[in-house]
Protein backbone atom coordinates (compact mmCIF):
# COMPACT_ATOMS: atom_id res chain seq x y z
CA UNK A 1 0.00 0.00 0.00
CA UNK A 2 2.82 2.36 0.88
CA UNK A 3 4.66 1.55 -2.35
CA UNK A 4 1.51 2.19 -4.38
CA UNK A 5 1.10 5.63 -2.83
CA UNK A 6 4.74 6.47 -3.52
CA UNK A 7 4.36 5.37 -7.15
CA UNK A 8 1.21 7.46 -7.61
CA UNK A 9 2.90 10.54 -6.16
CA UNK A 10 5.97 9.97 -8.36
CA UNK A 11 3.86 9.65 -11.53
CA UNK A 12 1.89 12.77 -10.69
CA UNK A 13 5.08 14.69 -9.97
CA UNK A 14 6.71 13.62 -13.23
CA UNK A 15 3.57 14.43 -15.20
CA UNK A 16 3.33 17.93 -13.78
CA UNK A 17 7.06 18.44 -14.26
CA UNK A 18 6.68 17.55 -17.94
CA UNK A 19 3.88 20.05 -18.43
CA UNK A 20 5.66 22.80 -16.53
CA UNK A 21 8.96 22.47 -18.39
CA UNK A 22 7.46 21.95 -21.87
CA UNK A 23 7.69 24.73 -24.42
CA UNK A 24 4.56 26.64 -25.34
CA UNK A 25 3.50 24.80 -28.48
CA UNK A 26 0.24 26.63 -29.20
CA UNK A 27 1.72 28.36 -32.20
CA UNK A 28 4.22 25.66 -33.14
CA UNK A 29 2.41 24.42 -36.25
CA UNK A 30 1.62 27.95 -37.36
CA UNK A 31 5.33 28.75 -37.62
CA UNK A 32 6.38 25.30 -38.84
CA UNK A 33 4.51 25.16 -42.14
CA UNK A 34 5.75 28.43 -43.71
CA UNK A 35 9.29 27.41 -42.85
CA UNK A 36 8.80 23.98 -44.41
CA UNK A 37 7.40 25.55 -47.59
CA UNK A 38 10.42 27.87 -47.77
CA UNK A 39 12.75 24.89 -47.40
CA UNK A 40 10.96 23.08 -50.22
CA UNK A 41 11.49 26.06 -52.52
CA UNK A 42 15.11 26.43 -51.43
CA UNK A 43 16.66 23.08 -50.41
CA UNK A 44 19.87 24.89 -49.47
CA UNK A 45 18.03 26.49 -46.55
CA UNK A 46 17.32 23.15 -44.91
CA UNK A 47 19.29 22.48 -41.75
CA UNK A 48 19.26 18.76 -42.50
CA UNK A 49 21.58 19.27 -45.45
CA UNK A 50 24.19 20.90 -43.24
CA UNK A 51 26.62 18.49 -41.65
CA UNK A 52 29.30 19.36 -39.18
CA UNK A 53 32.85 18.78 -40.24
CA UNK A 54 33.98 15.24 -39.72
CA UNK A 55 37.23 14.32 -38.05
CA UNK A 56 39.97 12.68 -40.12
CA UNK A 57 41.45 9.32 -39.08
CA UNK A 58 43.76 9.49 -36.08
CA UNK A 59 41.98 12.31 -34.27
CA UNK A 60 40.18 12.10 -30.95
CA UNK A 61 36.46 11.38 -31.41
CA UNK A 62 35.34 11.08 -27.79
CA UNK A 63 32.13 9.18 -27.33
CA UNK A 64 30.44 10.41 -30.53
CA UNK A 65 31.43 8.08 -33.36
CA UNK A 66 29.24 10.00 -35.83
CA UNK A 67 31.82 12.78 -35.93
CA UNK A 68 34.38 10.62 -37.72
CA UNK A 69 34.52 10.79 -41.51
CA UNK A 70 34.76 7.02 -41.62
CA UNK A 71 32.04 6.66 -38.94
CA UNK A 72 34.29 4.30 -36.99
CA UNK A 73 35.45 5.42 -33.56
CA UNK A 74 37.55 2.80 -31.80
CA UNK A 75 39.07 3.52 -28.37
CA UNK A 76 38.13 7.21 -28.73
CA UNK A 77 40.15 7.60 -31.96
CA UNK A 78 38.78 7.83 -35.50
CA UNK A 79 40.04 5.01 -37.67
CA UNK A 80 39.58 4.08 -41.30
CA UNK A 81 40.04 0.88 -43.21
CA UNK A 82 41.54 1.05 -46.69
CA UNK A 83 40.40 -1.83 -48.81
UniProtKB/Swiss-Prot annotation:
Disulfide bonds join 54-69, 61-73, 68-78. Keywords: Cleavage on pair of basic residues, Disulfide bond, Hydroxylation, Ion channel impairing toxin, Knottin, Neurotoxin, Presynaptic neurotoxin, Secreted, Signal, Toxin, Voltage-gated sodium channel impairing toxin. Its main location: secreted. Expressed by the venom duct. The keyword Disulfide bond applies. One of its GO terms (molecular function) is toxin activity. The modification 4-hydroxyproline is found at residues 56, 65. Belongs to the conotoxin O1 superfamily. The presence of a 'disulfide through disulfide knot' structurally defines this protein as a knottin. The cysteine framework is VI/VII (C-C-CC-C-C). This is Delta-conotoxin-like MVIC.
Amino acid sequence: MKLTCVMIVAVLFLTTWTFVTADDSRYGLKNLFPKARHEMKNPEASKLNKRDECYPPGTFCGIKPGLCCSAICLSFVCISFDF
